[in-house]
Regions:
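Acidic, Ser/Thr/Gly/Pro-rich low-complexity segments and short DxT(G/T)-type signature motifs
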Residues: 217-222, 310-341
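A short beta-turn/strand-edge loop motif at beta-sheet boundaries
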Residues: 137, 240-247, 289-294, 302-305
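Short, surface-exposed alpha-helix to beta-strand junction/turn motifs within ectodomains of secreted
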Residues: 234-274, 311-319, 326-329
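Beta-propeller domains with acidic blade repeats across secreted/periplasmic ectodomains
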Residues: 1-234, 243, 272-275, 279
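Cytosolic C-terminal regulatory domains/tails of membrane transporters and channels
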Residues: 295-302, 309, 315
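A mature extracytoplasmic/lumenal domain signature
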Residues: 38, 160, 198, 239-241, ...
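Aromatic sugar-binding surface patches on proteins
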Residues: 277-283, 289-290
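Exposed aromatic-hydrophobic patches
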Residues: 182-183, 282-286, 296-299
């Protein structure tokens, strides 16, 4: 074997057990990326970009505490990163890494969460990756997100609109035996592989597991796309829906903000639920415009983190299957209204 050290970080790593260098990714141009801890460490917490020849490096976003995972992919070669905001995080998920951005550890946040999850669902995130654009059935092109703490994996949809995209996450119905950390799509079989680990702050019973998530060609009935509308949410499913099951009583929407103590989650008032076509429904959520980024940004550009809309639904597909899932919707932007000629 041949090993070559073509880049060496000039910063001291430090003796703290939190002074980690995390993950390793490349973009389409061959640049390397990794994240590093800023907690109990002499390092600057951030995402580091290294040139293909290893001769230069720069930060792509700083002010990160303990960014265990990141990812690169999608049609725009987006860089995602997941931080752990505290030892007992009140939320988690992931956001986009951008040069010059701050993420709320020691400074005010200037970039919102792309996907936020309640701590009961994910309190310590791993990495992300993009599923194959064609070889993964109805979930092709979705973003895969991992939870180290809750031993779970999620498939996510991104609505790429201005000023900042909206994100939607659905948990795979599998309880993993170890903390999910590093997802990758195999270049030969195009299926998803996740390496898992057990350390502190995880529900994992086992130390070290590798999983394969594969598309079996069997019919899929669950959700396969989502979007924010001016009046609520639009959900698209992978199979035809039984129209009689599409009704308000089959859905429950609430905001679960684990950063605030309270007896019950804040319930959303649902309006009309419409069947747009055989696979798509639109749910009217009153005052959804209050969730937008414009209402969470102060005059200095600082952004508050908003709890996701948790939407539970129990529907029927025309083949008789029950579709019972929860989608976590992170609303940042509303689409532009169409003007009439």
């Amino acid at each position: 074997d041949y090993y070559e050290n073509f880049y060496e970080d000039p910063d001291e790593i430090g003796a703290s057990y939190h002074a980690f260098i995390y993950d390793l990714n490349t973009d389409k141009s061959g640049n390397f990326y990794f994240s590093q801890s800023g907690y109990k460490s002499p390092l600057t917490g951030g995402v580091v970009k290294v040139s293909p020849d290893g001769k230069s490096a720069e930060f792509i976003g700083t002010d990160l505490r303990n960014p265990n995972g990141m990812g690169i992919g999608g049609p725009k070669d987006w860089i995602t990163v997941a931080d752990n905001p505290s030892g007992k995080a009140v939320y988690n998920g992931f956001f986009l890494a951008k040069k010059g951005a701050y993420y709320g550890y020691q400074k005010s946040r200037t970039v919102p969460m792309l996907v936020r999850l309640p701590a009961s669902v994910d309190s310590s995130s791993g990495s992300q990756c993009w599923s194959h654009t064609e070889k993964w059935g109805p979930l092709s092109g979705s973003v895969i997100h991992t939870s180290y703490s809750q031993c779970s994996a999620f498939y996510c949809f991104i609505q790429d609109i201005q000023p900042y995209p909206n994100g939607f996450a659905v948990r795979f119905p599998f309880n993993l035996d170890s903390g999910a950390m590093r997802p990758r799509v195999h270049p030969i079989d195009n299926q998803l592989y996740i390496t898992c680990h057990k350390g502190w702050d995880t529900t994992a019973p086992l130390d070290g597991v590798i999983y394969r998530f594969r598309y079996t060609q069997e019919p899929v009935v669950g959700i396969c796309d989502a979007a924010v509308t001016h009046s609520g949410l639009r959900l698209t499913f992978a199979s035809d829906l039984e129209s009689s099951s599409v009704k308000t009583s089959a859905l429950k929407a609430y905001k679960k903000d684990d950063s605030k103590k309270g007896p019950e989650p804040l319930a959303y008032k649902l309006g009309k639920v419409q069947l747009i076509n055989s696979t798509t429904i639109e749910i009217n959520i009153l005052d959804i415009e209050k969730e937008s980024l414009l209402n969470r940004t102060d005059e200095n550009g600082n952004i508050s983190v908003n709890a996701p809309i948790c939407l539970e639904y129990k529907l029927k597909s025309k083949n008789g299957s029950t579709i019972e899932q929860t989608i976590y919707a992170t609303v940042n932007s509303l689409p532009e209204e169409k003007t009439k000629d």
